[in-house]
Curated annotation (Swiss-Prot):
Induction: Expression is activated by FOXJ1. Residues 50-125 are annotated as: Interaction with COPS3. The keyword DNA-binding applies. This is Myeloid leukemia factor 1. One of its GO terms (biological process) is DNA-templated transcription. Residues 39-67 are annotated as: Disordered. Changing S149A: No effect on binding to YWHAZ. Highly expressed in skeletal muscle, heart, testis. Also found in lung, but not in spleen, thymus, bone marrow, liver and kidney. Interacts with CENPU. Also interacts with NRBP1/MADM, YWHAZ/14-3-3-zeta and HNRPUL2/MANP. NRBP1 recruits a serine kinase which phosphorylates both itself and MLF1. Phosphorylated MLF1 then binds to YWHAZ and is retained in the cytoplasm. Retained in the nucleus by binding to HNRPUL2. Binds to COPS3/CSN3 which is required for suppression of COP1 and activation of p53. It comes from Mus musculus. Involved in lineage commitment of primary hemopoietic progenitors by restricting erythroid formation and enhancing myeloid formation. Interferes with erythropoietin-induced erythroid terminal differentiation by preventing cells from exiting the cell cycle through suppression of CDKN1B/p27Kip1 levels. Suppresses COP1 activity via CSN3 which activates p53 and induces cell cycle arrest. Binds DNA and affects the expression of a number of genes so may function as a transcription factor in the nucleus. The modification Phosphoserine is found at S6, S8, S32, S34. It is found in: Cytoplasm; Nucleus; Cell projection, Cilium; Cytoplasm, Cytoskeleton, Cilium basal body.
Length: 267
């Protein structure tokens, strides 16, 4: 299951080293769990000084025992089918994201948690997000946290067609080491500021289009007779509530209640 969900992360250089180290740690932990149970479970005594010997069973019993173990194979087949479905979904989304005139958003994440004895829990988290807009505009976000090694990483990339500017930050909470790197794709470092402005302008252009479209939809809706009637009723209700509030204030003023303040103690 973990392999199925993390395959896309393992192929990414940003996550690859951390995933390999984490997987090896998980293997060692699972190996330590399986060692006490490594002997043949069918040779366990039945409590009366006798053992179950699989070889002494007839073919019918042996096939029955084989059938009892096969649910694990059923689970494997189910996971394989799930893996195929996810891969097909990723292929379809990949084709959709290549449309130069479309918007798309893709997000993937994986998390593992393990705790052995009195040791502190080990948490591993990784996530990646990709947003695309027409005109070759793209933003990528990646993050990873490993409590075992104390390492935290994040990367944010802005892209326009084949040009890109990626900023990566990393910090080791155990050693206190911090590092910041920048990557310039198909451009010089001196062009980074102008590229960032260009990327922001492209993003704002599509945001303004979205706002104008929503405003147009609201304007059309207000012209509908039902909307006008609903607006009129809301106005009447609002005026009635204001008038009622005024009367309540007058009534309170007439009461002219006097007294000493009471101190309230919160527990």
């Amino acid at each position: 299951m973990f392999r199925m969900l993390s395959s896309s992360f393992e192929d990414d250089p940003f996550f690859a080293d951390s995933f390999l180290a984490h997987r090896e740690s998980m293997r060692n932990m699972m190996r330590s769990f399986s060692e006490p149970l490594g002997r043949d479970l069918l040779s366990i005594s039945d409590g009366r000084g006798r053992t179950h010997n699989r070889r002494e069973r007839d073919d019918g019993e042996d096939s029955l025992t084989h059938a009892d173990v096969n649910p694990f194979q059923t689970m494997d087949r189910m996971m394989a089918n799930m893996r195929s479905g996810i891969q097909e979904l990723q292929r379809n989304f990949g084709q959709l994201s290549m449309d130069p005139n479309g918007h798309s958003f893709c997000s993937s994440s994986v998390m593992t948690y393990s705790k052995v004895g009195d040791e502190p829990p080990k948490v591993f988290q990784a996530s990646t997000q990709t947003r695309r807009a027409p005109g070759g505009v793209k933003e990528t976000r990646k993050a990873m946290r490993d409590s075992d090694s104390g390492l935290e990483r994040m990367a944010v990339g802005h892209h326009i067609h084949d040009r890109g500017h990626v900023i990566r930050k990393s910090k080791n909470n155990k050693t206190g080491d911090e590092e910041v790197n920048q990557e310039f794709i198909n451009m010089n470092e001196s062009d980074a500021h102008a590229f960032d402005d260009e990327w922001q302008n492209e993003v704002l252009k599509y945001k303004s289009i979205g706002r104008s479209g929503n405003t147009g939809m609201r304007s059309v809706g207000h012209e509908h007779p039902g909307s006008r009637e609903l607006k009129r009723r809301e106005k009447i209700h609002r005026n009635s509530a204001i008038e009622s509030g005024r009367r309540s204030n007058v009534f309170v003023d007439k009461l002219n209640v006097k007294g000493s303040p009471v101190k309230i103690t919160k527990k």
